[in-house]
Amino acid sequence: MLKTTIIGASGYTGAELALMVEKHPELTLAGLYVSANSTDAGKCISQLHGKLAGVIEMPVLPLTDPLGVAQDSDVIFLATAHEVSHDLAPLFLQQGCQVFDLSGAFRVKGDDFYTQFYGFAHQHSEWLDKAAYGLAEWNEEAIKASQLVAVAGCYTTAAQLAIKPLLISQLVDTNQWPVINATSGVSGAGRKASMTNSFCEVSLQPYGIFNHRHQPEIVHHLGCDVIFTPHLGNFKRGILATITMKLQDGVTKEQVAHAFAQAYDRKPAVRLKGDVIPRIQDVEFTPFCDLGWRVQGQHIIVISAIDNLLKGASSQAMQCLNIHYGFSPLTALL
């Protein structure tokens, strides 16, 4: 059994991970931790997340001795802020732990990227270079080999799973940039209360126009420019992305369908719906990405639906763990 520790366990993604670890036949939950100054420190996780009552009755402890935690852990999940993951990941890695980081701290190679888009100077370029990008369906070999897996972002997962098959098959005319309009539930902003996310204030609206940090992450890993506009939806969880692309001259519906089928053959976390339009309702509380599409003339619209807390975060992290250790990819996820 792999001794597994979750740092940042009080948040939504941390709680989802705790439940997955508890269900996993090859993992044992070694500890749940939050930052030393967190108001959640010392509370039972079932007190913070009622759905875990009777399932996990373990205290969420303040992280005051990271080296001690590392010595008692085989696997570390970091469900922490970007800067916190940046500082903690190298410490755990140096102690021999396998690390799955759900933040953006190691997703994009290039130190100046973090200064520009995350507001801090990256100090660990050696680990940045070694990190595997955790887009599970598209990076299995690197995930198997790397001690550090930087789990892909939520919007970036929904977008890339929809675009990559067509891009790899050279069916897209990239002279016209793919246009991604994606709407996320309020849980994407985390558990901390804010006026914008409060019940009476939350409203469907775009945000981060031209400057959302997932845009350069998408561009970096796709290898082509995109226009990305995220939206805040007045619902709890899920992402629905609607992506418009121009196809190369002469591309047929059959070629499009073949590209998706070829890309996701034996990839059980991606469900191809064809001309059936995906819905958040069908993917929330699941580890799946549903993809549907329609072709008209030279244009295609692809719809991608995921649960932002699961396929967009925790279940993808666990999927990466399963890939790394050679377990069935959806172990503990269904």
UniProtKB/Swiss-Prot annotation:
> Which residue pairs form cystines in this protein?
none
EC category: oxidoreductase
Protein's name in the database = N-acetyl-gamma-glutamyl-phosphate reductase
Part of which pathway? Amino-acid biosynthesis; L-arginine biosynthesis; N(2)-acetyl-L-ornithine from L-glutamate: step 3/4
> What is the recorded function of this protein according to its Swiss-Prot or TrEMBL entry?
Catalyzes the NADPH-dependent reduction of N-acetyl-5-glutamyl phosphate to yield N-acetyl-L-glutamate 5-semialdehyde.
Gene encoding it?
A: argC
| GO CC, any one term | cytoplasm
Q: Which GO terms describe its molecular function?
A: N-acetyl-gamma-glutamyl-phosphate reductase activity; NAD binding; NADP+ binding
Q: What is its EC number?
A: 1.2.1.38
Query: Its catalytic activity?
Result: N-acetyl-L-glutamate 5-semialdehyde + phosphate + NADP(+) = N-acetyl-L-glutamyl 5-phosphate + NADPH + H(+)
Q: Which GO terms describe its biological process?
A: L-arginine biosynthetic process
PROSITE patterns tied to this protein: ARGC
Q: Where are the active-site residues found? A: C154
The family classification in the record reads: Belongs to the NAGSA dehydrogenase family. Type 1 subfamily.
